[in-house]
């Protein structure tokens, strides 16, 4: 009985650790008030997907310009087609778009992309959608 409990605890630990390792890493590179657009700011970030990482369904309430730096990613907006992007390719999300698929295209290799957001000053970068 004790052996089964130990195995269960180890498996739970491994599964939890694996799930936690699958989260995207977001790094803010620059934020700038846009004086010609009162109340707006530009935010430049990088997003790194570990191998197999996926995003929750969300929106940005912003204009989001995506540029793939490394690896490949899969993106899809509600009502749109799923697209696979490789280094040098771009993607756009509008303020009203719901992002239903965002993930690394390769379960064994990470991916990295640059995102320029034009958004309301102080607004959240990502808003979960149910």
Predicted regions and their residues:
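Ligand-binding loop in jelly-roll beta-barrel domains
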Residues: 82, 97-122
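Histidine-centered metal-chelating micro-motifs
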Residues: 54-56, 74, 91, 95-104
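Extracellular/periplasmic catalytic domains that process cell-envelope and extracellular macromolecules
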Residues: 39, 59, 67, 84, ...
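Short acidic-glycine-tyrosine-enriched beta hairpin
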Residues: 34-38, 48-50, 79-96
